[in-house]
Amino acid sequence: MAILSDKTIKEYLEEGKIVIDPLKDEQQIQPSSVDMRLGDEFKVFKVIRKPYIDPKDEEDIAEYMESSTVPEGEAFIIHPNEFALATTQEYVKVPDDLVARVEGRSSMGRLGVTMHVTAGYVDPGFEGRITLEISNIGAMPVALYPGQRVCQLVFETMTTPAELPYGHPKRNSKYMKQLKPESSRVKLDYELKK
């Protein structure tokens, strides 16, 4: 696997092989990645009277979360030990012969804010806004602003195009074409349906 350079990223964007929309300015394209901006919708867990979340539970996990939209110019405050779901402003299409990785920007990491807990991998064929699993592991609350560059997308080549890319009818592509933060759909995983 090879990581795409800024030159190749620009070529693929011009050809439409990679789609990042909107790409507000060329400064988002870094030497080997593309800076992604924070969207304006967030989901956080509600305080509920339940001892734990069971992925096999028929109750929808979405019921344990509440959504909010942050108006332009205002901030979403993430407190220490808090977790929130958000998305990038940009809608992304990854071709069948590339994968992408979400990496936090070091400027955010130095504040104690991570942009993905475990799902930093974007499959070939994915299309939609990238989900961010934001955590504050620092000691102070941090203000996050919609439109702020918070992470970067790194593209890597594959040895061959995927035979069954994300979104293929034979795949269980639970988050294809998502536009806003989506709660976990883990209960749809085939091994939990048995």
Curated annotation (Swiss-Prot):
Question: Family, per the entry?
Answer: Belongs to the dCTP deaminase family.
- InterPro entries reported in the protein's UniProt record: dCTP_deaminase (IPR011962), dUTPase-like_sf (IPR036157), dUTPase_trimeric (IPR033704)
Q: Which GO terms describe its molecular function?
A: dCTP deaminase (dUMP-forming) activity; dCTP deaminase activity; nucleotide binding
Name the gene for this chain. dcd
Q: What is its EC number?
A: 3.5.4.30
> Which residues are noted in the entry as dCTP-binding?
105-110, 123, 131-133, 152, 166, 174, 178
Give one Pfam family: DCD
On whether Hydrolase is a keyword of this UniProt record, the answer is yes
In Swiss-Prot or TrEMBL terms, this protein is called dCTP deaminase, dUMP-forming
